[in-house]
Amino acid sequence: MLQPARRKFRKEQKGRNTGLATRGADVSFGDFGLKAVGRGRLTARQIEAARRAMTRHIKRGGRIWIRIFPDKPISRKPAEVRMGNGKGAPEYYVAEIQPGKVLYEMDGVNEQLAREAFRLAAAKLPIATTFVTRLIGS
C-alpha cells in the first residue's frame, strides 16, 4: 500500500479541505482520466482497491497512472482509552482530494473499455467522480 517512506513529523493537524484543485486538474499522461467532482479523503486502501479493479478489467492492455498519493497521517486512540494523555498514534494515511483533481489516468485502451474500468474503480471510492478525456493538442 502507498505511504510515505519517511516524514519530518509523525503526526499532523487535522486542517480543512477547502478550495478547488488547481494543480493536477488536467489529464497529463494518458488519454483518459477519472476526475474528482466531490471533495474528501481517500485512504491508501481505497486507492489500491480502485487500482486493482481497473487493472483486472483492462487485463494486459493499457497503462494506468495514479495521480494522487496518501501523504497525510491520520491518528487514532485505541478502543476504551480515556480522553487526554496526548494524541493517538498514526493509524493510516490519506490523500486530501479537492474537486477537479485527476485521480487516475489510462492509456493504450479504447474509450469504451476505459469508461467501464473507471466506472468499476469509482464504485470503490467514497467521492463523486467523472470520466474525462485529454484535450487535443495538450
From Swiss-Prot:
Coiled-coil features, chain-numbered ranges? none
**Which Gene3D superfamilies does its entry note?**
Ribosomal protein L10e/L16 (3.90.1170.10)
**Biological process annotations from GO:** translation
Q: Name one GO cellular component term.
A: cytosolic large ribosomal subunit
List, as start-end ranges, the regions of compositional bias called Basic residues.
Answer: 1-13
Extract the ranges annotated as region (Disordered): 1-22
Keywords of this protein's UniProt record, alphabetized? Ribonucleoprotein, Ribosomal protein, RNA-binding, rRNA-binding, tRNA-binding
The record's section on CDD domains has: Ribosomal_L16_L10e
UniProt GO molecular function: rRNA binding; structural constituent of ribosome; tRNA binding
Record's InterPro entries? Ribosomal_uL16, Ribosomal_uL16_bact-type, Ribosomal_uL16_CS, Ribosomal_uL16_dom, Ribosomal_uL16_sf
Q: Please give the subunit comment from the record.
A: Part of the 50S ribosomal subunit.
Q: What does this protein do?
A: Binds 23S rRNA and is also seen to make contacts with the A and possibly P site tRNAs.
Which family, according to UniProt? Answer: Belongs to the universal ribosomal protein uL16 family.
What PANTHER family does the entry give? 50S/60S RIBOSOMAL PROTEIN L16, LARGE RIBOSOMAL SUBUNIT PROTEIN UL16M
The name this protein goes by in its record: Large ribosomal subunit protein uL16
- Please tell me the species this chain comes from: Thiobacillus denitrificans (strain ATCC 25259 / T1)
